[in-house]
Amino acid sequence: MTNNIAIVTGGSRGIGRAAALKLGAAGYTVVVNYTSNAAAADEVVTSIAAAGGKAVAIKGDVAKDADILALFVAADKLGTLKVLVNNAGVMDQQNRLDEMTTERIRRIFDINTFGSIICAREAVKRMSTKHGGTGGSIVNMSSAAAYHGAPGLGVEYGASKGAIDVLTIGLGREVAAEGVRVNALRPGIIDTEIHDSSGIKGRVKLMRDAIPMKREGTADEVADAIMWLCSDQSSYVTGSIIPVAGGRC
């Protein structure tokens, strides 16, 4: 599997970091995409190498088409793309829609939705047997917010993730006969840095009572689900959206 490539967008922290480490341990050459924190991305690469794996860090903003294209061209030089983890995503401070600026809404969609769609397009061009590929797995990152809508917290975030659900179902069916499987995870309250963006201090702990399992999830637990979707154990699974939310959705 030395020439099999896995791209993880937003791979320098949280769920992306956990997925990158596990993919590296599984034998993939991991392309760790990051936007600004080079030190964090380098730490992931170093950790993968220390465990006997291979990885490179590539800077790129998934809100910019040119950066996405450069990311995939760089990956092409390393081997055959087999896995895309569409993980890059952002949220903003708690707010109502009628108090949001257009710039905020557009930024959320540019990163969470359009970035994921363009990355998926580029992955299909490389994985699909229609284009001479040998198949592969795309794992999109949705959110429990796509289900409950995040009222009063950030409905634009929920909407951006709802679009990911539709992308997953539609694209999963579109390329099912071409060796490409497309699935999504819908994480609930996971203990990662993204919650800091909400502006709610201690948000993860505050949400525990709303979770049937009475605890937050971990990045590793989500990454384990990613690994299953990338493996042959899920070979008959495509166009599916799987909650990883402790029973909350």
Placement of each model-derived feature along the sequence:
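C-terminal substrate-recognition "lid" of short-chain dehydrogenase/reductases
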Residues: 215-244
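Catalytic loop of short-chain dehydrogenase/reductase
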Residues: 133-134, 139-163, 168-177, 189
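Substrate-binding pocket helix/loop in short-chain dehydrogenase/reductase
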Residues: 95-97, 104-109, 207
